[in-house]
């Protein structure tokens, strides 16, 4: 797989050096996804528990290509046919994304485009055998269809990746609690409230230890924007932001962000 301008821009220069070290050492180290699969995962969503506790989460479609999901191609700004529901094993990553959306509401109000009010939800979910590690599934895809050149950046991605893919659906019985975050645009006060899901079924389960075995993508050219930090994946977070907006988000959250572009990919996935 040949990529031109593989690393286009970094939000902070220090992360580029760290990424280069990581890319060299990744094949020799044990990445995060090699740990025990999580028993609990998290998802940010704008839908209230009145809906989610009743219906759970359902994927957009039946496209189970892992690469197209991780690059956002099958997500909302793409074809909207992904067969996966994105979750994260890191609550903090999910909180950072919620904070970003809340900050957007505040800035819109300052610009005269809204009230500044914001309501967002973080759902705590019991993972089971239907949840697959995004990074390990990506490695499986590279091993099956790609070549060794793709493993270097995949190793760097795996170190940051905290996304777990639920295939097709997350039933209400897997959703343990929801944390409601409300920001009052008038007073500036933010309140957080947790609610249990009365339909939740308590079991001792974990995410699948195996990667998801994906079909091969038919796309001949894939333009990929991978956010290395602090977000979890293209379908988990927003895909259409400019590098400037993403760098500004990085400054607000106190996190460094590395933007990696895979462009002009000659290899047909």
Swiss-Prot record:
Molecular function via GO: NAD+ poly-ADP-ribosyltransferase activity
Keyword Signal recorded: yes
Domain of life of the native organism: Bacteria
One CC-aspect GO term: extracellular region
Classification via InterPro entries: Borpert_toxA (IPR003898)
Keywords: Signal
Signal peptide: 1-34
UniProt key word Signal: yes
Family: Belongs to the bacterial exotoxin subunit A family.
Protein name listed in UniProt: Pertussis toxin subunit 1 homolog
């Amino acid at each position: 797989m040949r990529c031109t301008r593989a690393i286009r821009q970094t939000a902070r220069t220090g992360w580029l050096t760290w990424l280069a070290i990581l890319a060299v050492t990744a094949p020799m180290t044990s990445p995060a996804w090699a740990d025990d699969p999580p028993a609990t995962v998290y998802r940010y969503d704008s839908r209230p528990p009145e809906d989610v506790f009743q219906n759970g989460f359902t994927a957009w479609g039946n496209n189970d290509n892992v690469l197209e999901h991780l690059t956002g191609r099958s997500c909302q700004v793409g074809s909207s046919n992904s067969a996966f529901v994105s979750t994260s094993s890191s609550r903090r990553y999910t909180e950072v994304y919620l904070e970003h959306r809340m900050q957007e509401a505040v800035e819109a109000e300052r610009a005269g485009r809204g009230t500044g009010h914001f309501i967002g939800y973080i759902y705590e979910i019991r993972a089971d055998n239907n949840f697959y590690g995004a990074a390990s599934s990506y490695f499986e895809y590279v091993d099956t269809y790609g070549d060794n050149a793709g493993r270097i950046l995949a190793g760097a991605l795996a170190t940051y990746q905290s996304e777990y893919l639920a295939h097709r659906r997350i039933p209400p019985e897997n959703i343990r609690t929801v944390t409601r975050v409300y920001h009052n645009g008038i007073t500036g006060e933010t309140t957080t409230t947790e609610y249990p899901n009365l339909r939740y079924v308590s079991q001792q389960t974990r995410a699948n230890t195996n990667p998801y075995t994906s079909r091969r993508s038919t796309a001949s050219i894939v333009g990929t924007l991978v956010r290395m930090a602090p977000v979890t994946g293209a379908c988990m977070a927003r895909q259409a932001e400019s590098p400037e907006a993403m760098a500004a988000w990085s400054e607000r959250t106190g996190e460094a962000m590395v933007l990696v572009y895979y462009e002009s990919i000659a290899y047909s996935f």
